[in-house]
């Protein structure tokens, strides 16, 4: 019979510390969800869901774009509603400057954001034209970051964007993704690649770019 495998004491200590930290983090996240903490709730990336948080610089750049778009509104422009698709790390910064923001996410941890959270599953988009019907034609700005760099994911993301736009000619769209998606994206939405390059807290292997149906670069400072 093989001898039992045992870890060196220092390795075991590191492992136990890691497990303790993970347990604490999970407990904190569960508490935030239960208490509907709101925009101050913080969560770790879940790589299994292809979650990668934006850098502070990128979050602030996109927040400032939203601020400028809001400043262009007139008193008779009506409500300005914002949808964030699969980009939860943007939520806090955008929510701090505007009240009407919904975060569309598959990850139910973000129920901590209360009524601003909308659970959605891209797999339900193609088979059901009434999916999320209460949100159809409700949004003036949509910022999306599709979770996967696949043709199917881009097609479904474009479909839900089209449904959510209040007015397809006037609603603004910003989409951040890997450059590889460009032919699939531009075949489905009237967007162009911008000079603005979103960055993440952790460097990604794919070349990450942005697309928009308006001149996004004019709104980006120090691009």
Swiss-Prot record:
Cross-referenced Pfam families: N6-adenineMlase
Its annotated compartments are:
Cytoplasm
InterPro entries listed in its UniProt record:
DNA_methylase_N6_adenine_CS (IPR002052), Efm5/EEF1AKMT1 (IPR019369), Mlase_EEF1AKMT1/ZCCHC4 (IPR041370)
The record's GO CC annotations read: cytoplasm
Q: What is its EC number?
A: 2.1.1.-
Keywords for the protein's UniProt record, in alphabetical order: Cytoplasm, Methyltransferase, Transferase
GO: which molecular function terms? nucleic acid binding; protein-lysine N-methyltransferase activity
Domain of life here?
A: Eukaryota
Biological processes, Gene Ontology terms: methylation
Q: What does this protein do?
A: S-adenosyl-L-methionine-dependent protein-lysine N-methyltransferase that methylates elongation factor 1-alpha.
Q: Which family does it belong to?
A: Belongs to the class I-like SAM-binding methyltransferase superfamily. EFM5 family.
Protein name (database record): Protein-lysine N-methyltransferase CG9154
Q: What species does this protein belong to?
A: Drosophila melanogaster (Fruit fly)
């Amino acid at each position: 019979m093989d001898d039992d495998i045992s870890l060196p004491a220092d390795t075991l200590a590191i492992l136990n510390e890691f497990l303790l930290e993970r347990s604490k983090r999970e407990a904190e996240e569960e508490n935030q969800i239960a208490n509907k903490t709101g925009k101050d709730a913080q969560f770790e990336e879940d790589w299994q869901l292809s979650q990668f948080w934006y850098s502070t610089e990128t979050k602030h750049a996109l927040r400032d774009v939203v601020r400028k778009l809001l400043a262009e509104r007139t008193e008779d422009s009506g409500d300005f509603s914002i949808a964030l698709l699969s980009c939860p790390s943007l939520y806090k910064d955008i929510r701090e400057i505007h009240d009407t923001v919904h975060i569309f996410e598959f990850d139910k941890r973000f129920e901590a954001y209360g009524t601003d959270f909308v659970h959605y599953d891209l797999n339900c988009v193609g088979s059901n034209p009434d999916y999320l019907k209460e949100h159809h034609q409700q949004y003036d700005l949509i910022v999306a970051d599709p979770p996967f760099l696949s043709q199917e994911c881009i097609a479904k993301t474009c479909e839900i964007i089209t449904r959510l736009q209040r007015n397809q000619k006037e609603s603004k769209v910003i989409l951040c993704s890997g450059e590889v998606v460009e032919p699939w994206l531009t075949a489905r939405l009237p967007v162009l690649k911008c000079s603005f390059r979103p960055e993440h807290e952790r460097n990604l292997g794919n070349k990450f770019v942005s697309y928009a149906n308006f001149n996004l670069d004019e709104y980006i400072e120090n691009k």
